[in-house]
């Protein structure tokens, strides 16, 4: 049993303290994204929110969750998405909408068709870490505003691509509303009290479903705050758990959420082990991220419509503007 507490601590393992989170193409081609076979949810959204969203990554669990959140919010889900493989004649059902999946070789032509029919479309990306930069470069080339919910990739190159193209983008390692608020508080503390934890020892443990290949972007963001607070940390020391058995027995993830969870623990100890601090945020399911992603798309759409001078945003910008539903 892994414990991040000092040996003298007799209280239960930190992950066990609370167990209340049991909730819930081939050849490039021109296409019509308003084909009769694509039936959109018959919900009338408020006029100010009536705009189309294309979710890239509907074949994945996170992308599918976002697509479902789009339709349940009364927004127009563009019935187009993409796969990393050239798979023909495949569709994914989202509510009453059949989303057609295209392979990578068709991306540019299909997206150009989408822009022709929906000039105000916003893309929400939940693909794979190794697709982040190529996707972002294409969105920027076509002038497509996008929300990058996919973590990983070369983040510096990602920001540079957006800056060089002057495109609109919202990039965040974390889309969960309340977790975003926690991150904002951590950043404020780091800015206001630099060096406050100088000399402290930090241990970090994160657990996600086995399908998550990269290290938690949220954990990286929190660690960056601790480093500003004076803590030295080697990312190679982070405990990354992806084994379901360990997640059940050691971390305490509810069995029904093994395939979709995000548990994080940060434990700080003073040089003499006499003082300790612990920060923990655990999420079961994907709804918190899906809803936040829709909020992000709404926010970015408003910025594009108002021709805002700022072009790159994050979820803290959304939070500060009070754009969370």
Swiss-Prot record:
Active site: 208 (proton donor/acceptor), 212 (proton donor)
EC annotation from Swiss-Prot or TrEMBL: 1.17.1.8
Keyword Transcription among UniProt keywords: no
GO molecular function list: 4-hydroxy-tetrahydrodipicolinate reductase; NADPH binding
Residues annotated as transmembrane: none
Pathways per UniProt: Amino-acid biosynthesis; L-lysine biosynthesis via DAP pathway; (S)-tetrahydrodipicolinate from L-aspartate: step 4/4
Transit peptide: 1-32
GO cellular component: chloroplast stroma
InterPro entries per record: DapB_C, DapB_N, DHDPR_bac, Dihydrodipicolinate_Rdtase_pln, NAD(P)-bd_dom_sf
EC top class named in words: oxidoreductase
Chemical reaction(s) catalysed: (S)-2,3,4,5-tetrahydrodipicolinate + NAD(+) + H2O = (2S,4S)-4-hydroxy-2,3,4,5-tetrahydrodipicolinate + NADH + H(+); (S)-2,3,4,5-tetrahydrodipicolinate + NADP(+) + H2O = (2S,4S)-4-hydroxy-2,3,4,5-tetrahydrodipicolinate + NADPH + H(+)
Protein residues bound to NAD(+): 57-62, 149-151, 172-175
Biological role: Catalyzes the conversion of 4-hydroxy-tetrahydrodipicolinate (HTPA) to tetrahydrodipicolinate.
NCBIfam families per the UniProt record, alphabetical: dapB_plant (TIGR02130)
This protein's name: Probable 4-hydroxy-tetrahydrodipicolinate reductase 2, chloroplastic
